[in-house]
């Protein structure tokens, strides 16, 4: 006789960092997020990027059109900051409830970021307006200078960009997104109530050895890149401590299989189908399941000043096999942990 499965019931979570793409890709991936999460902060790095209120409204509608009947899901839209963005347009979007936050991509830091900001000084009028409005700034925290080693770009960003910015605009709300280093974990932990962080499942579960030892695993390649074990452990310890300003942000970033498994593959993990169970596995390994619901469902709304979701989801602890691939128009998607057996999954 098998032992009864363990069930975890938590308030419905939100995903505070997701890429839903557009077109056929959007139609394929949206249901994996809308089935589980009540809300999601949607990244604006389309081609062209979402820089106007009208573009955000149109994109939001395309997302909603892809949500299956029976899913109760609200996309929270963001504005892509550029060197030439009009502060009045940003303010209008925020006041009208179209923009929840604005996203700072250093130019060329990641996928579709060539329109990103070349220097924080260039967009200071926009950031000052955001500070005045109480509008959160979401930051991809990496410098992009060619002479900086890719494994050092996050730590260098803290000292050269993030800290000077927060010293200059002391009332600005900042989310340090997808943190990957001990440096960032300590920086956010020691910061004030205006600084928070999202953490992905892959950066909690894996380090660069998993991606590079015994063969290159392209489906673990994302930006910021996986770091040393010491950094992975610092992230795990931060979430296991019950720290209240760290919350779930999958950074689910789908690319067609042929764009990942190639001589110059794209960065991003499509983890929407498996992320919640992956987080549960980490919290269980750290003997921290008591803090799991807060990380997934409570800390994010608190930081954003939003109410928590009224419904609940259940995860079951029984081994399940993750599909090796998901059909995508004339290609396929490989989900995070595809072809592997996982311990926790959404019931």
Swiss-Prot record:
The modification N6-carboxylysine is found at residue 103. The lineage of its organism: Bacteria, Pseudomonadati, Pseudomonadota, Gammaproteobacteria, Enterobacterales. This is Dihydroorotase. Binds 2 Zn(2+) ions per subunit. It comes from the Bacteria. It catalyses: (S)-dihydroorotate + H2O = N-carbamoyl-L-aspartate + H(+). Pathway: Pyrimidine metabolism; UMP biosynthesis via de novo pathway; (S)-dihydroorotate from bicarbonate: step 3/3. GO terms for cellular component: cytosol. It holds the Pfam family Amidohydro_1. Homodimer. CDD domains: DHOase. Its EC number is 3.5.2.3. Zn(2+) 2 binds at residues 103, 140, 178. Its cofactor is Zn(2+). PANTHER family: DIHYDROOROTASE. Catalyzes the reversible cyclization of carbamoyl aspartate to dihydroorotate. It is an enzyme of class 3 (hydrolase). Substrate binds at residues 19-21, 45, 140, 223, 255, 267.
């Amino acid at each position: 006789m098998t032992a009864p499965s363990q069930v975890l019931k938590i308030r419905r979570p939100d995903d505070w960092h997701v890429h839903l793409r557009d077109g056929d890709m959007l139609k394929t991936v949206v249901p994996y997020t809308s089935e589980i999460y009540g809300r999601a902060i949607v990244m604006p790095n389309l081609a062209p990027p979402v820089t106007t209120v009208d573009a955000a409204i149109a994109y939001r509608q395309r997302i909603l059109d892809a949500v299956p009947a029976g899913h109760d899901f609200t996309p929270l839209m963001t504005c892509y900051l550029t060197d030439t963005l009009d502060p009045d347009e940003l303010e209008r979007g925020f006041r009208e409830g179209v923009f929840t936050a604005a996203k700072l991509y250093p130019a060329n830091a990641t996928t579709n970021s060539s329109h990103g900001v070349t220097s924080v000084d260039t967009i200071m009028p926009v950031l000052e307006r955001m500070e005045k409005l109480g509008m959160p700034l979401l930051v991809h925290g990496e410098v992009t200078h060619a002479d900086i080693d890719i494994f050092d770009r996050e730590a260098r960003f803290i000292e050269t960009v993030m800290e000077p910015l927060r010293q200059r605009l002391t009332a600005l709300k900042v989310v340090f997104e997808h943190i990957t280093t001990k440096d960032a974990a300590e920086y956010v932990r020691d910061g004030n109530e205006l600084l928070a962080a999202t953490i992905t499942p892959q950066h909690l579960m894996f380090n660069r050895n998993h991606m590079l030892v015994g063969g290159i695993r392209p489906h673990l390649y994302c930006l910021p890149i996986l770091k040393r074990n010491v950094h992975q452990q610092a992230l795990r310890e931060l979430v296991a401590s019950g720290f209240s300003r760290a919350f779930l942000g999958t950074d689910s970033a789908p690319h067609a299989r042929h764009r990942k498994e190639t001589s110059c593959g794209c960065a991003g993990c499509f983890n929407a189908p498996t992320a919640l169970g992956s987080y549960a596995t980490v919290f269980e390994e750290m003997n921290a399941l008591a803090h799991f619901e807060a990380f997934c469902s409570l800390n994010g709304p608190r930081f954003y000043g939003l109410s928590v979701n009224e419904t609940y989801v259940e995860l079951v602890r029984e081994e399940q096999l993750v599909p090796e691939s998901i059909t995508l128009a004339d290609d396929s998607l490989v989900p995070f942990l595809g072809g592997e057996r996982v311990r926790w999954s959404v019931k």
